[in-house]
């Protein structure tokens, strides 16, 4: 926390925020722990980067992605400054094995994700990541745009 405070205090961001990306193996690992971190850091220049796939680390979370997303936005919406877009798929390997996949090829509830994201500032970035080819990025973008169109959400 001291390091984050030090960075924010030194930079004194005016039009941006410093945010930590959630990862499955380190804190913050949930909406509640991210909220605790925001309170502990106690700086206006600290915000939230939301990557829902990075906090899906159990079958319980995997089968309830819509609930996880809605809970995260309800608790942290005003602090969210950008999001990552990808998808997740549970494989039949032992032990629990979760893979990142192209949006639309997994179980992430993009209807919930885009609905909640649409409630934020219209310039909140949604960035597709970790794909291998331009074609995969195009496929991902087409899927996300298709879901948004079904929901009548402009992108």
What are these regions (language model features)?
Residues 1, 5-12, 35-39, 73, ...:
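A structural alpha-helix within SAM-dependent methyltransferase catalytic domains
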Residues 1-50:
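Active-site acidic/histidine proton-transfer and metal-coordination neighborhood
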Residues 5, 43-49, 67, 115, ...:
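N-terminal pre-domain/capping segments
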Residues 13-14, 44, 79, 120, ...:
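Helix C-cap/helix->beta junction micro-motif
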Residues 18-20, 46-50, 81-84, 124-129:
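Hydrophobic faces of well-ordered beta-strands that scaffold small-molecule active sites
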Residues 26-46, 59-73, 137-145:
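Distinct, well-ordered alpha-helical segments
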Residues 31, 54-123, 132:
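Gly/Pro-rich active-site loop or hairpin
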Residues 117-155:
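C-terminal appended segment following the main domain
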